[in-house]
């Protein structure tokens, strides 16, 4: 199979414990290191579908990157860590949980468009480096 023979999309079910870029590199190896790119970045602690385009289809990535996305998540209440995720050191545990009404009223604030400020331990690039890499150096 030649590189220019490969064009199209796959939706990889990325497991927990691997970065989106590492997943892409593994898939590229299967397809003879052909040109490929993905839409969005899933945190290494996240699992989910990672859309990967190959060959000429990489030109269509821009159309998918602006589309609506849906996230399903699980919350562990009461644990505060140094990084805001499961990789950080647990700083404190609080055994007080929000009521179901409080949760319902809060999630209604997330319907519609809003600007989300990226967490300092996110994959967002800051001066060419991932924010979480810079933040971990300061710990």
Language model features by range: what are they?
Residues 1-139:
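Catalytic/RNA-binding core of pseudouridine synthases
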């Amino acid at each position: 199979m030649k590189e220019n023979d490969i064009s199209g999309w796959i939706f990889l079910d990325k497991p927990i414990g691997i970065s989106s870029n590492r997943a892409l590199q593994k898939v590229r190896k299967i397809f003879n290191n052909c040109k490929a790119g993905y839409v969005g970045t899933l945190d290494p602690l996240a699992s989910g579908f990672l859309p990967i385009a190959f060959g000429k289809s990489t030109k269509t990535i821009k159309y998918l990157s602006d589309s609506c996305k849906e996230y399903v998540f699980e919350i562990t209440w009461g644990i505060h860590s140094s990084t805001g995720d499961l990789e950080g050191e647990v700083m404190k545990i609080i055994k007080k949980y929000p009521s179901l009404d409080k949760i319902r009223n809060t999630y209604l604030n997330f319907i519609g468009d809003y600007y989300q400020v990226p967490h300092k331990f996110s994959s967002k690039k800051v001066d060419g480096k991932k924010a979480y890499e810079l933040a971990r150096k300061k710990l």
